[in-house]
Amino acid sequence: MAKNRFPGLGGGFNINQLQKQAKKIQEEIEKLQEELNQREIEATAGGGAVKVVINGKKEIKSIEISPEVVDPDDIETLQDLIVACVNEAIRKVEKMIEEEMQKVAGFGFTGLF
C-alpha cells in the first residue's frame, strides 16, 4: 500500500487541481494589476500646498504647487514639500496594491509586485 507522502494535505491531494487554482489566481492577479495600473492616487503636503497624482505603476501624473509656497528666498521648503508629497503618494500606491493583492491571493504575494 502506498504511503501518503503529504500527510498534512490529506489523502485526496490532487496536484492538477492545485495547478488549476494557481493558474486562476495568477490570471486574477494579472487582471488586477492592469486595473491598478489605471487607478490614480492623490497625495498632498503642506496642508494642500503641494498635490501629487500618481498611478498604480508609480508614475507621477501631475504635480500642483500652490503659488503661496513659491518663495524665491526659500526654495528649500518647496523642495521638501515636493519630496514629502511624492513619497506619500508612493506609500499610498504601495498600500493600495498590497491590500488589493491580498484580496485576490489571500496571503503575502505582495512582495513580488
Swiss-Prot record:
Keywords: Cytoplasm, DNA-binding. Gene3D superfamilies: Nucleoid-associated protein YbaB-like domain (3.30.1310.10). It is found in: Cytoplasm, Nucleoid. Its main location: cytoplasm. Transmembrane segments: none annotated. GO terms for cellular component: bacterial nucleoid; cytosol. Pfam families: YbaB_DNA_bd. One of its GO terms (molecular function) is DNA binding. Coiled coil: none annotated. Belongs to the YbaB/EbfC family. Binds to DNA and alters its conformation. May be involved in regulation of gene expression, nucleoid organization and DNA protection. Homodimer. This is Nucleoid-associated protein Csac_1593.
